[in-house]
Amino acid sequence: IYGSIHEAALYDFSEMTLKQTGRYTLKAELTPWPDGIKVRKGNHFTTSWRTIQIAPEAVGLINSSLILNLNEPCVLETTDWIRPLKYVGVWWGMHLGVETWKMDERHGATTANAKKYIDFAAANDIEGVLFEGWNEGWESWGGMQNFDFTKPYADFDIDEIVHYAKEKGVEIIGHHETGGNIPNYERQMDHAMQWYTEHGIHILKTGYAGAFPNGLSHHGQYG
């Protein structure tokens, strides 16, 4: 027997966690705000659905439509503009420790390295290439994560890279890592999106890998 405890239709509400209160008992707990309040709402509100799924085989949990059906229908009138694609990118070398996000002697997102990845993508029918660590601010990692989303590092020539990718028929995937510093990102967001558009980049990956400021949680109502 396989089981899953989860939730659906989680909108403007804290995520549920499970706390073991006995050998066979669990208690649902909500991730609080820094002041201990679980959820800030008016007099009338709707909680998320809480689900329990049980199946004789693990694949039954994956194949279940329960959570899908408890969520609201898609609000988009048309979805034909959504295009899935396969991509590679400069990021795994950082996790392996052979490259860095910040600009130094092992910097991963350089113009020369970008062209190598674009060549590989073009040769293997891979539509896109993602570059992490292309913009100023990675040296602040571990602090406030003050990224600048329109200033490439000096060794990352955005215009040359975009032009090279276009010649090869490869899409550039932009990257905005907030590091959890959401206020810093929101101040720059409109300008950063326009900047990408002006440079011919129309696909974006965002990241929220760092801790939120002021004790806020990724799993609380704020996140």
Language-model regions, residue ranges each:
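Generic structural hydrophobic/aromatic packing signal, biased to beta-strands
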Residues: 1-3, 49-53, 88-90, 129, ...
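An acidic-aromatic substrate-binding cleft motif
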Residues: 42-119, 124, 128
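Aromatic- and carboxylate-enriched substrate-binding clefts and catalytic-loop regions
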Residues: 132-223
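N-terminal accessory beta-strand-rich subdomains and adjacent acidic, glycine-rich linkers
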Residues: 1-76
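Bulky hydrophobic/aromatic packing residues
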Residues: 33, 37, 45-46, 78, ...
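Generic recognition of flexible, low-complexity loop/linker segments
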Residues: 37-40, 116-118, 161, 192
